[in-house]
């Protein structure tokens, strides 16, 4: 089982236990959308936004998991990665469920991005990325469970792994570099 799937399963369980009406994919997409729109990596602001999305204050275990999710996203952006890690079901999950989760991820991203105040207008390229995400959010369940469907899903997922980086470069707050130790 991959780390990505372990995190997805863990979040699914936590959200189900707390009777929260949000999928792990939507939650992760929401966080990434906020970060890419310029919300930064403030823990308190993320916990507040997550509580609003979840429809109530999360319990301690879920709060800790939300903090870990923020750390994972921060790591993606601070490590100079060329793609983000998406919180989605593994490849063994039926294609229809993976496609639904991908659509939920896009919905969450668009909501997080849209709810975050930004300065200035977007470039045409950034607007195109957001339009693509809106279209992908509507595709839920429309891919056939076939080799072509798998190929289409993988291509869309790979696109979505790099698309947030363009939006982050345009709108996101630069990461604060870690303080360098002083030598005495």
From Swiss-Prot:
Superkingdom of this protein's organism: Bacteria
Disulfide bonds: none
A single GO cellular-component term on record: cytosol
InterPro entries xref list: YgfB-like, YgfB-like_sf
Pfam families, sorted: UPF0149 (PF03695)
PANTHER family reported for this sequence: UPF0149 PROTEIN YGFB
HAMAP family: UPF0149
Family (UniProt): Belongs to the UPF0149 family.
Name used for this protein in its record: UPF0149 protein PA5225
Source organism (scientific name): Pseudomonas aeruginosa (strain ATCC 15692 / DSM 22644 / CIP 104116 / JCM 14847 / LMG 12228 / 1C / PRS 101 / PAO1)
Taxonomic placement: Bacteria, Pseudomonadati, Pseudomonadota, Gammaproteobacteria, Pseudomonadales
């Amino acid at each position: 089982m991959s780390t990505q799937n372990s995190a997805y399963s863990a979040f699914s369980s936590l959200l189900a236990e707390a009777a929260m009406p949000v999928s792990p994919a939507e939650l992760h997409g929401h966080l990434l959308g906020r970060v890419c729109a310029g919300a930064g990596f403030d823990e308190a602001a993320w916990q507040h936004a997550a509580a609003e999305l979840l429809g109530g204050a999360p319990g301690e275990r879920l709060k800790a998991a939300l903090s870990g999710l923020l750390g994972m996203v921060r790591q993606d952006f601070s490590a100079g990665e060329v793609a983000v890690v998406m919180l989605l079901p593994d490849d063994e999950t039926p294609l229809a469920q993976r496609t639904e989760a991908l659509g939920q991820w896009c919905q969450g991203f668009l909501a997080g991005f849209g709810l975050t105040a930004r300065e200035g207008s977007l470039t045409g390229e950034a607007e195109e990325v957001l339009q693509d995400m809106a279209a992908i959010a509507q595709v839920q369940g429309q891919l056939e469970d076939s080799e072509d469907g798998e190929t289409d899903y993988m291509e869309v997922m790979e696109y979505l792994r790099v698309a947030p980086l363009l939006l982050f470069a345009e709108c996101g707050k630069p990461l604060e570099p870690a303080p360098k130790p002083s030598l005495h």
